[in-house]
C-alpha cells in the first residue's frame, strides 16, 4: 500500500554543528527519509526557516518547533494520503501553512516532509529517486561547480567575493571530470602551502587563504589548474577558443557587500573601493574578458534590478549569469526576471522555496524560457544526497555542491558516481553543452 501511515521528524545536526530537521515518512510498504540543509548567506526573499530562538539552547538555533509541527499538524493532515501523489501532498502542505513564505510551519519542516514523501514514493515504485521524478529521459550527469577558494561571508580573509569555483567542462564522462576537479583541488592545496598560505577549509570544503586581493584569488585558481596538468579555458568546440579543460565560475554574493543606502558596492574586506551599479557591471565585464569565466552567480545585489539588467546587457551573451538571491528558486521572481530580461540562469536550492513540486516548477519555467538551472547545496549540509538525484532527474546539467573535501559535500559527488555507473552507456555528460552562452 502507498498510503502514508506515519510521519516523524527529529532534530539532527548539520555540517556546521547547528540543528536541522530530519523527517521519516512511512507507508505500509515503503519508507523515505530526508534531512534539510541551511544557508549562511540567505536571500531576504527566501522561504522562512523556523528556528526556536531560545538563546539558552543551541544559541537560539534549535528547530524543535519545526519538528513539533511535523509530528503533530503535518502528520495529522497527511495521514491516509497516497505517498505517490507528490503534487497533492505539496499542495496540502502549502495550504496547511497558509502564508506566502511558509513562516507558520517553517520551510524546514515542510521541505523535510516533501522530500521524504518523494523518497517513500520512489521506494514504493521500486525506482531510484532520479527515475521516479524524471522518468525514462533522466540521464544527464551534471557538470560540477567546485568551490575551491572562499572569501566574503564564508571566510575570515581579505577577499570580497564569496566563491571561486572550477567547472571541468572538457570531458566526456562525469567520473573523469570529477577526477580533474580533485587533482586541481590538491594542486591548489600544494600551491597555497608552498606560498605559506592557509590550507584550512571552510564550510563548503574550499580553502580560505588570506590573499592580497580578489585578483590574486582567481589567479591562484587558474595557476592550480595548470599545475594539475590541465588548461584553463573553453574547449575547441566553443567558438574555436582553444583546447581548455576547466573554466571558472564565481559567486561574489554581491548582496553581502551592497550598501542599499549608498546604492554602492563596497569592497569592505579588501580595498574599501565603492562602485555604482554601472561600475560593478563593467567590473565583471572586465573580469570576463581577462579570465576564463563561464558563470557568475549573484554578480549584482538581490534587489538591484537595474544593475542586473546592465550586467545582462553587457555580458549575458557570453557568460552564464545565475540568479540565487535574485530568484530564490521562486517561480514568481523568476518570471519577473524573464520579463525584465535579467540573468540567464537560476540557482535551485530546495529549501529556498520549500517543496519539491515548487522546485520542479521553477526548473521547468527556466527551461521553457531558455534559462539554465544549477542545482545547489547550502553551506550547512548533511549526508543527504537528494540534490544529486534531482540534478539527474531534471537533466539540469549543472550542480553546485562544494569542494573536493568534507563528507557532506563528497556524499553528493559519490552518489552521482553511483548513478553514472547505474546508467551505464546511456549516461550523458554535457560538458560545455550544459551552458547556453
From Swiss-Prot:
Catalytic residue positions: 204 (proton donor), 349 (proton acceptor)
GO BP term (any one): glycolytic process
Keywords: Cytoplasm, Glycolysis, Lyase, Magnesium, Metal-binding, Secreted
Cofactor note: Binds a second Mg(2+) ion via substrate during catalysis.
Gene Ontology MF: a single term: phosphopyruvate hydratase activity
PROSITE patterns in UniProt: ENOLASE
Residues reported in the UniProt entry to bind (2R)-2-phosphoglycerate: 162, 349, 378-379, 400
Described purpose of this protein according to its UniProt entry: Catalyzes the reversible conversion of 2-phosphoglycerate (2-PG) into phosphoenolpyruvate (PEP). It is essential for the degradation of carbohydrates via glycolysis.
Protein name, as recorded: Enolase 2
Organism: Chlorobaculum tepidum (strain ATCC 49652 / DSM 12025 / NBRC 103806 / TLS)
